[in-house]
Amino acid sequence: MIPFIPSSFGDIVAVANIAHSIYQALRDSTGSSFEYQCLIDELSSFKDAVGCVDRVLKATPLNESDRQAIQAEITRCHELLRKFWGRIEKYEVVISSSKWHTSIWRKVTWAILKTNEVANFRQKLLQHKSNIIVFLNAVTM
């Protein structure tokens, strides 16, 4: 896999798009368990935070240190999301091509990911979102 190197703040949009793809794929399944719904909510919140970063950075000049810190965090977010998306994407495409996909999609995803993996992903996503909020606070003060 080619490493993701953010060359501009437009790359933030790529991270938001992956988060949205995962969110959309999970949201489209019905009858999800509590943990599953929490992950969906966390992805939505993360996507909103990344979108906020994009808007703030377009309007706020940054020094090189802040720019590098934000780029490093965006790179880490991108890696996390790509790995998770890579685990579920192939199943989403196959399952969504038929009419019975909604309940099967959830079952297959949980069978593949297991509750611990989803909880671990949620925790990492929450940490990245917290880091993003810290960066936002720092550049807007």
Task: Enumerate the language-model features and the residues they cover.
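Elongated alpha-helical scaffolds
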Residues: A72-E89, E117-N120, K124
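N-terminal amphipathic alpha-helical segments
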Residues: M1-E73, F84-I95, K99-T102, R106, ...
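Alpha-helical bundle protein-protein interaction modules that mediate dimerization/oligomerization
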Residues: T115-V118, K124, H128, I132-L136
